[in-house]
Curated annotation (Swiss-Prot):
The keyword Repeat applies. Keywords: Cytoplasm, Cytoskeleton, Repeat, WD repeat. This is Serine/threonine-protein phosphatase 2A regulatory subunit phr2AB. Belongs to the phosphatase 2A regulatory subunit B family. GO terms for molecular function: myosin phosphatase regulator activity; protein phosphatase regulator activity. InterPro entries: PP2A_PR55, PP2A_PR55_CS, WD40/YVTN_repeat-like_dom_sf, WD40_repeat_dom_sf, WD40_rpt.
Length: 483
């Protein structure tokens, strides 16, 4: 059995705690870019915060833990109002996805409930005209002379409205006129470099229901967006049209039995995508089979004994998030109580089922009354698919091993960050700690604060580094192998 990784707290970005968290600063989206050098964080106020990893030698000598610093922040979405439906459209960022880098510019997709935007983020040099530099001697054809000695055979004429004048004669008489000897030439210099974000494309008026997912294709040119009943295929360079690839809306809405909860493209096969439903099923679609993929290529569903069904069965079986492993071999799904790992070649049952918080089953009535039972927890895998991450209540986050029963439980809290504090900007803070992981058996349901929850998480594409969002704060944890 492999030794568990030694997870340590690395950094935190955000506010001062749940009690001080304003609604606009709550974090609903976190995403690493393809290199892992950037982290994008979206908040409920429509802003996107970008963090950049530092690679300076001095920081690496002091600590082996990775360090991220503030890079940029911009307003992605504004609150809107749909006058046709008399509905307010929140500015909250639902999802963020990084696009392939082009030249020195970063590109990313952001979406709220209705509108998707493609942003270009780049470093812009602000130039200014510096103080004029004084140069002695006349200028001819752009060259500067250090003195006023010229060849006798070289005569230069200048023309104006009064006619031609011999410039050599003027130069001989310039000893009494310093204004002709001293030329002030302005110089253009770079004053500063600022990070600028500009919207390149706006994709809108395609979704009648709230957008819950966006996923970039492996071809780097297309992506899908899904709402409760439809999935659309877009081209990044065309925002005037899209193609509907899945439509589960019935003719009569009274016959509606399920909704789409999440969708994602295959990491390597550009024609394959999957989507999950509120019935607990995962369906695989193939764009080569037909333009409209209502007839799925595969369906992943686990049989449930009818005798075990209850009033809450359908609610807790609804899948809140799905992820492909980076090689496309496995599918990770999360519902309210469990985390399931599926083999793409085996549809009838998952290869691994993990009970996240089985101790909450007796409290389902209470969770239904306070609406916690409808919370949507995200999940993710590491770069080789051997580690799985998801969140829970009381700001707990669980890291599971695919090949064993290892469960590393960490608590994302401010109490873990008292040892060292360093202010980076007015909007961010960096803290370090060595708090030991919590044992899962030490968790007591009666002591759990259900207002504290880690719903959103992301894993570095190459390293053992995770980012989780709790209220208005982002926590970073890094791990090393025990020796």
């Amino acid at each position: 059995m492999t030794e568990p990784l030694d997870w340590r707290f690395s950094q935190t970005f955000g506010g001062k705690g749940n009690e001080d968290a304003s609604d606009a600063n709550v974090v609903p989206a976190i995403e690493f870019d393809q290199t892992g050098d950037f982290i994008a964080v979206g908040d409920k106020g429509g802003k996107v915060l970008l963090l950049k990893r530092t690679h300076d030698k001095q920081s690496s000598k002091k600590s082996k833990l990775p360090e991220y610093r503030f890079y940029s922040e911009f307003q992605s979405h504004e609150p809107e109002f749909d006058y046709l439906k008399s509905l307010e459209i929140e500015e909250k960022i639902n999802k963020i996805k990084w696009c392939p880098k082009q030249n020195d510019a970063q590109f990313l997709l952001t979406t709220n409930d209705k509108t998707i935007k493609l942003w270009k983020v780049y470093e812009k040099k602000i130039k200014q005209v510096s103080t004029s530099a004084t140069t002695t001697g006349p200028s001819y054809n752009g060259s500067l002379a250090s003195n006023n000695t010229r060849s006798p055979s070289h005569t230069t004429y200048i023309y104006n409205s009064s006619g031609a004048h011999n410039m050599n004669n003027n130069m001989n008489n310039s000893n009494n006129n310093n204004n002709l000897n001293n030329f002030k030439i302005p110089k253009l210099t770079t004053r500063e470099t600022v990070v600028t974000a500009t919207p390149r494309k706006i994709f809108q008026n395609a979704h009648a229901y709230h957008i819950n997912s966006i996923s970039l294709n492996s071809d780097g040119e297309t992506y899908i967006s899904s709402d409760d009943l439809r999935i659309h295929l877009w081209n990044l360079n065309i925002n005037t049209e899209c193609f509907n690839v899945v439509d589960i809306k019935p003719t009569n809405m009274e016959d509606l039995t399920e909704v789409i909860t999440s969708a994602e493209f295959h990491p390597t096969s550009c024609n394959i995508f999957m989507y999950s439903s509120s019935k607990g099923t995962i369906k695989l679609g193939d764009l080569r089979s037909s333009a409209l993929c209502d007839n799925h290529a595969k369906v992943f569903e686990e049989y449930e004994d009818p005798s075990n069904k209850s009033f809450f069965s359908e609610i807790i079986s609804s899948i809140s998030d799905i992820k492909f492993s980076r090689d496309g071999r496995y599918i990770l799904s999360r519902d309210f109580l469990t985390l399931k790992l599926w083999d793409i070649n085996m549809e009838n049952k998952p290869v691994k089922t993990i009970q996240i918080h089985d101790y909450l089953k007796p409290k389902l009535c209470d969770l239904y009354e306070n609406d916690c039972i409808f919370d949507k927890f995200e999940c993710t895998l590491n770069h080789d698919g051997t580690q799985m991450l998801t969140g829970s209540y009381h700001n707990y986050l669980h890291i599971y091993d695919r090949n064993s029963k290892q469960d590393v439980c960490l608590e994302a809290s401010k109490q873990a960050t008292k040892s060292k504090t360093k202010t980076l900007t007015t909007k961010m803070k960096l803290r370090s700690s060595k708090k030991e992981p919590k044992k899962p058996e030490d968790i007591h349901p009666d002591a759990i604060e259900y207002t504290k929850k880690t719903l959103h998480c992301a894993w570095h594409p190459k390293d053992n580094l995770i980012a989780v969002g709790a209220a208005n704060t982002v926590y970073l944890y890094a791990a090393t192998e025990n020796k």
